[in-house]
Amino acid sequence: MNGSPGLHLLIEYMLMEKIANLDRKILDIIMRNARIASKDVATECGVSRAAIHQRIQRMIDLNVITGSGYNVDPKVLGYRTCTYIGVNLERGAMYREVVPELEKIPEIVECHFTTGPYSMLIKLFARDNEHLMELLNDKIQMIPGVTGTETLISLDHSISRVLPVTYDD
């Protein structure tokens, strides 16, 4: 088979019953607690710790698991304003040119190419309104291809959760 080894593994993985039931159970456990010990996952799943390690590593290799880490309250770091910004582009196709410029702005934590009234929707954190104005006026709106922005300030973060994972017991 031609192509990258990763692609070959991904196709092989997809040919399995999408994601095996045990893998789904592992995902459910580690998505709820990324710090859980492999031995505890193994106990809950009724398999060896080595099996858990191998399955997690395989899911990482196949980009089923794309990251792990800790969630830190942005306010503790001095970022008090959470903002969603609708960005309009000259042409939607400019998305690929604009994204690398947005990646240079560390306060931007998410970027989505969207349907609807905006070409893109970005989420960023600013220290305060003055900092937000600097980011908008001196950085985002200066990117070639950006024709306009609309800013929505989040007043409260109400829901934060992981997606549900279904599996057979």
What kind of region is each of these model predictions?
Residues 1-169:
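A compositional/biophysical signature of low hydrophobicity enriched in polar/charged and small residues
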